[in-house]
Every structure is written in structure tokens, then in C-alpha cells.
Amino acid sequence: MNYKLLLGVALFPFTSSFAENFAEDSLKNVSLQEVEIVSVRATNKTPVTYSNINKEAIGSVNLGQDIPFLLLLTPSVIATSDAGTGIGYTGFRIRGTDANRINVTVNGIPLNDSESHGVFWVNMPDFASSLEDLQVQRGVGTSTNGAGAFGASINMKTENIPLLPYGEFNGSYGSFNTSKATFKTGSGVIDKHWAFDARLSSIGSGGFIDRASVDLKSYFAQGAYFNERTMLRFITFSGKEKTYHAWDGVPDYILFPSDPAVKANRTYNPAGYMGDDAEGNPQYYPNQTDNYEQTHYQLSLLQVLNPNLKLNAALHYTRGFGYYEEYKQDQNLDEYGLDNGKGVTPLVNTSDLVRQEYLDNYFGGMIFSLDYSRSKLNLSLGGGGNYYDGNHYGNVIWVKNYAGDPSFVPSQEYYRSKGKKSDINIYLKGNYSLTKNLNIYGDLQVRRIDYAIRGKNDVWDWLAGGMQDLDIHPVFNFFNPKGGIYYQFNPENALYGSVAVAHREPNRNNYTDAGTNEVPKPERLTDYELGYQFNCNNWAFSANLYYMKYKDQLVLNGKINAIGEALTSNVPDSYRTGIELTAGIRIIPGLEWNGNLTLSQNKIKNYTEYVAVYDSDGNAEPVQQADYYGTTDISFSPDVIANSLFTFKYKSFTARFNSNYVGKQYLDNTGGQTDINEKDTRKKERSIDAYFVNNLRLSYNFGKHVSVNLSINNLFNEQYETNGWVWSCYYRQAGGGLEPYTEKSYFPQAGINVLANVALKF
């Protein structure tokens, strides 16, 4: 048995002879950390398109931003931030695929929310400081646990427990009063069988966008028992956040004013607006915040049954609770179950109010894999089952000038619903060496989902005269086969190809925000990948062709719901196709360049958009307007994404200069439809302009225990946006004609900004 491994990055400065003897005695017992969770990862002869990011690479960019921004140099990745800083509410897309179609696991355990399918990185502040490495698979990838990988998957492995006692402090401070403080400590190996490790973090920022402040706290702790054949590890991590709303974006008429004399306001935030005071100054609700806490528990077992057979198993449990609070103007009191003041003078039909909407949820389950490896064959039998229980409810805590029901008391509940979901999957995957050069790969997965939503939603149903009634209970059975070949011509050249099928069930918003008489369908993806790899001493190159054919793809339609979540609709026939090129070269000793380029086309065939029509009184007509556009571009899917990274190292000094280019993106699927906004007479395309952003990072190590870092983001002060939304409708005119109306908002990112960092190791 081979016990060699890397066990951590921060070793206590004992004398070298003591450390060597201690390590030799302990390595036999702790080597198992390196063979955990291999069943859900791709390896060097798996015909899957993937990128590995190791601990050093993560640490080089981890000064406080969320994980989506740490992945920016990965091929085909776009990141966005509501606050414009990369901290707080952030998200990403891979190959144009939005985040709730990207499977994310931690140590093989599902992280995606069972109902929304998203991962809310704001609930996991500074999690990158507790990562050993991560793998990004593009396309369907290998079978994994949790929500289906429908364009990409990310597998994160938490930090190995170091051999020796240690302590670390890592602190950052910079623009927008952004700060990060991280404390880490570990016991080292105790009595040859035990070890413990912990982290505490605090992150704060005022945000680039007005009032878009964040206050984030988190911890990570783990303890393990191990011997030569067994590792039992308990991990817990938690995040608590308080974030001021910035999810509405900046309206286009403020960001792009039609009057040249009016200066654009890139930091404007409409959230929490309460009206103007007597002097005409806008007033904003101070507690327009999102408040949530989420805690994860993992208990994992790795048992070496014999030299060729290993068992991985884990139990997991996640507890989440929180709410967002917001000030809403001119709300119809009927929609909150409040007596609207009939018979009262003066009559009160609408009023400003403050509401809180809660999410109280539980998620738990187990995963396992039995991994066999011998000679030419690697085989994994694995799977898992989990159960989710989530309560959604809302309270009205204050009503302005309310003259209605005198029995009203603060925190009056106006809706409640429950979501329950079970998810079971089992997979069998194998990689077999037919010859010295040729490997064949097969992967079969069966997945069953049982989902139920019942109760009242937070949306008023005017036809029914009450809150939207929810009684939804779909059941899905999916079969996801995958297969491919990997051919190694020689040590420098390799070729691979694969075909994979994936299915994905609609999420909660797909059901609750669907149009009238519209029932969302499950999606099907057939993914074709063909890749070439070249590696030699001083340079490397790879090219990957992909064609992703969708049936009933749920594509972003440019609209958002009341809390800024992007909405989707099914399209029968669509595809994504492109080429991903990566290259790296050691130019001279100490100077390296790495880059990647994605060129793609992302199309919907025979696209028809259905648009709401309102009468002169603002009431929705029963039949929507159908606008046919033919073949169009899929929203938020640029044709070009390019990254470049120059790294210069001289003794203890390192400089990194990276560039990121993203081509034009459309806000919806109409392929660049132009609009006339009632507050902006210019016609403006429903799109996000291309942008080119450059960052410079400098670091210097004062020996092994002290380092300083400086990050200058957006070095050339590019004025750009990474996300946006559009809402459109028609108004029926007196003569029967239709008058279009559109609202658009964008999410600007910060101009040039700076973060300084110091790291101390003890």
C-alpha cells in the first residue's frame, strides 16, 4: 500500500530532524485523506473536460472575494456580483449555463439547494480558506450526487488536516471599507491517531453599489480518527450573513441617461426607497437586508477493505434559517390579507409596508461509493439519498397610515407553504485499459426525484381572489448514461471523446413563477465532447470541441422575481456548441503565461416569446401576445470568453497580471430586440456590452512565515456590467393596437479598487 501524500501547507517550525521522524511515523496513519471522494471526480484518463485548481492557486487569489470570482480564469466562466465587489451575493455561469444548473458538491456531498438548485455563496463566506482543491467539470461530466449537472459541475475537497500543530492569521483591507480576517489553528497528530483543525472568519464591505453592505461570519472545524486502514472524520462549517439588498440592479435610464448633460449614476440602488423628505432628498429603509444562517455537518468514513477495494460513506445534515426584510411602496392591502379600510374615512386601499419573508429548512442524507482498482480496471459503485423539508412564510411587520382592521398586529402572517423533496441516485462507472494506450469509460446513473409543494405562495392570484395556491407533486425517474474513450499516443499527446446524457427536473421557481396555464417540463441534454491534449516540459496546449443539444431547455428569459432571482422558460429545441482552447508556456525561467479562449454559438431554434398584454386599467388579458423570432441567441451566453495570466517570480517576489474578456450578452432570448423606454427615448438593445478587465496581484514572502499581498482589481478602470434583467409587456390602446413597454436594469461592477493582505504563519 502506498501511503505517500501531502498533508497540509502550514507546518509548525520544529527542527527538521524531529519533523522528519515524526512524519515517517505518522504518514502511515493519515494517508487516507488523499483518496477520499475520488468516485465523483475525473482523473487523467477520464474522457471528460475538466480543470483542477490546487491549494496554491486558490490561495494566490483568495483575499476575500467569493468562490465565483476565484474561478474567473477557468475556461468558459463568467462571474457577477450584485454589490459590484465580488463579495456578498455573487454568481457565475459556465458555457452560458446559469448557476442552478451547475452541480456543486463538498467532499462528494450535495451543496445545491434542493428547491432552487442554486448555491448561495453569501452563506459560505471565506470557504475557499478551508479548501484543499477543487475540480471544475464542463459539460455533463461524471455522475455525481445531488442536483443534475446540466452544463458543468464543481467538486470541492476540504482541507487536509496538517501533520503538525500550526496557527495562521490572514487579513485583508481595501476599497469600499472591505475587510477580511481569518484565524486558523490545528492540533497536528495526537497520539498517532487523532487530529483537529479549525477556522474563524469575518468579512465586511460597504459595497461599490450604494448601501450594498455585507457583514459575513463563518467557521470551519474538523476532527479525525485514523489508522492504517480507516479514517473517520467529522466536519462542520457554518456561515451567517447580513446583506443590504442590491438585487434590483441600476435602471437603464439612470445608468445610460439620454440627456448628455446628465451624469450616469453607476452606484444607484433603488432598494428600500421610502420617498423624499421635505427638502426633496430620497430616504431609504435602513434595514432592507437579507439575513440568513446555514450550518453543515458531515460524518465520513473511509475504509480500506483490501489493497484493491475501498469504501467511502458519509452522513450529512444541513440546517438553514433566515429571512429578508424590505420596505414596499403602494402595496395593495388585499394581497396581504388585510382589511383595506372599507367604511373607514379616508378609504385605504394601498399603503407602504414592511414585510419579512422567511425560509426555514432542513436537508440531510447519505452518500457512498465502493471503489475497486486493479491492474487495468477502475470501477466505482456509488450513490446516495437525501431528503429536504423547507418552510416558506411571510409576515407583515408594519403598515403605514393603516386605517383598516384594528386587530392587525405586527408580524401578521400572510402566506405559508412547505416544500418536501427526496432525491435518490445510484451509479456504476468504470475505466478500463484495453491496451497500453487506449482506455474506455462507461458511466450509468439512475436518479429518482419526488417533489411536493403545498400551501400558499407569496403572490396574489387576482383570478382566484387570494394568495396563489400551490399543490404541486411531480415525480421524475431519470436514466443518465455516459461513455467515452481516451487514447494516449505518447507521453506528450492524447485524444479523448465522449457522449453523455443528463436530465434535470424543474426547480421551485420554475413552477411558482410559470405563466398562466404553463407547466414547466424536465430538461434533457445530450453532450458531445472531443478533446486533444499536448504536454511537454515548457509548454502545454489543449483543445476541446463540444456540442450540447437540449430538449426543453429552461433558459433564462431575462426576467427576475421579487427577490432578484432569474426566471426561465422551456424552449423545445436549442443547443450550445463551441471550442475551448487552453495554453501555457514557460517563456524564460521565472516568467510563465497561461491563457484560455472559448468561442461558441448558443442558439434557440424557432423561438416564440409570449408577452403579457394589459388593458387600459392595468388588468392582464387572458391571452398573451405571441412574438416569433426564429433562431435566436440564448440569453447570457457570450460568443467569446478569453483569459490571460502572466506570472513572474523572482526569489520571494511574485507578480501576476491577468486579463478577462467577455463578449456581448443578451438579456433575453429575442436576439437583441431594441426598446423605447418611457423614461429614455433612445432605442437600446437588450444586451450587456462586451468588457475587458485587467487585474494586477503582487506578493512578497518574508521567509516561510510572513507574506504580504496587494491586489489591484480593474487596473484600467473599465466601466462595465456583468448581469442584468429585462421586463416587457404590451398595453392595449383605445383603437385596439398594442403599445410595447420595457424596463431594464443592469449590475455595474466596481472601477479600479485595491485590496491589501498580510498572512502570518506560526
Regions found by a protein language model. Give the residues of each.
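Face-selective signature of the C-terminal outer-membrane beta-barrel domain
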Residues: 292-460, 486-488, 498, 535, ...
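Transmembrane beta-barrel wall of Gram-negative outer-membrane proteins
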Residues: 166, 173-204, 209-246, 297-308, ...
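Short acidic/polar hinge/loop motifs at secondary-structure boundaries
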Residues: 110-138, 157, 254
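Short, acidic, small-residue-rich periplasmic hinge/interaction motif at the N-terminus
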Residues: 20-60, 99, 540, 544
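C-terminal beta-signal and adjacent terminal beta-strands/loops
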Residues: 593, 661-675, 700-762
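Membrane-embedded beta-barrel scaffold of Gram-negative outer-membrane proteins
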Residues: 310-316, 486-488, 494-500, 521-577, ...
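Extracytoplasmic beta-strand/coil segments of soluble accessory domains associated
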Residues: 68-110, 132
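Gram-negative outer-membrane beta-barrel transporters
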Residues: 436, 547-549, 569-671, 759
